[in-house]
Every structure is written in structure tokens, then in C-alpha cells.
């Protein structure tokens, strides 16, 4: 009888441990999603809203003069996007949440800011200007292409 009690207690302990681990990881996933939402809200308020005021033509003009104040301001705003992209690419932030929030927006933003990005890369060929942002956009593009394939195949 004592053997059955010991086995039952051990099984209950194992199940409790497994449940505790599951709860812990579920909490981590939720915290990561919440951190993504919080970081994106800050990014939107401090950066994306300002970048929305520029057009690709305007960015092209600004990119012609790297000494201009607007060039420096745009570079600083893009640096914040780069920092956010690092968080997404290193899985600190949840890429699925980012896709749901702004996948098309980031693709359009990269396209709009490309003249400035290319200018910075021309000036300093050894530096990695906005590589993480570009990696995020490419990842989003691959995901969108897969989604299109799936929907066109009727799956």
C-alpha cells in the first residue's frame, strides 16, 4: 500500500512540475507579446508618426545633403526603427504580433526611406546601416509571399 501511495505522490509531483513549467512558459510568451505591443506603441508615437509626414520624393531630396538637419533627424528616426527590428529579429519581440500590427507598413516605410538608406550605405560602405530593418522587411515579404501562395492554391 505504501508503494502505491509513494508512486501516486511521485506522479502527482511530476504532473505538478510539468504544469508549473507550462504556466511559466505561457507567462513568458504573454510577457513577450505585451513587450512587443508596448515597444511598438512607443515606436509609433515617437517615430512612425513623424516618418509618416515624409514622402519618398521628399526623402530622396533630403538624402542628397547628408549635412542637412533633416537628414540627421531622419537618420535618428530610422535608427529607432533599426533598434526595434533588432528586437524582433533576435526574438526579444514577437514577430507574429509585429506582422499583425504593421507588416505592410514596415514594407512601405522601408521603400519610402530607401533613398536615405542607400545614401548612408554609399557614404560608408563598411558600416551596416539599417541591415536589421532590411532583414525584418525581407522576412515580412517572404511571409506575405507564402500567404499569397497558400491563398492562391486554395489551401
Describe the residue ranges of each PLM region:
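Membrane-proximal alpha-helical anchors
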Residues: 2-68
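An amphipathic alpha-helical interaction surface
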Residues: 71-79, 83-155
Amino acid at each position: 500500500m505504501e508503494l502505491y501511495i509513494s508512486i501516486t505522490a511521485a506522479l502527482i509531483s511530476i504532473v505538478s512540475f510539468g504544469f508549473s513549467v507550462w504556466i511559466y512558459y505561457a507567462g513568458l510568451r504573454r510577457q513577450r507579446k505585451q513587450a512587443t505591443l508596448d515597444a511598438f506603441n512607443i515606436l509609433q508615437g515617437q517615430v512612425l508618426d513623424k516618418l509618416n509626414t515624409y514622402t519618398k520624393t521628399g526623402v530622396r531630396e533630403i538624402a542628397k545633403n547628408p549635412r542637412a538637419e533633416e537628414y540627421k533627424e531622419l537618420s535618428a528616426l530610422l535608427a529607432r526603427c533599426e533598434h526595434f527590428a533588432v528586437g524582433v529579429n533576435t526574438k526579444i519581440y514577437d514577430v507574429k504580433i509585429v506582422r499583425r500590427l504593421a507588416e505592410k507598413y514596415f514594407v512601405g516605410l522601408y521603400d519610402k526611406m530607401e533613398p536615405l538608406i542607400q545614401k548612408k550605405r554609399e557614404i560608408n560602405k563598411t558600416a551596416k546601416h539599417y541591415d536589421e530593418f532590411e532583414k525584418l522587411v525581407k522576412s515580412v515579404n517572404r511571409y506575405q509571399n507564402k500567404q499569397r501562395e497558400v491563398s492562391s492554391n486554395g489551401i
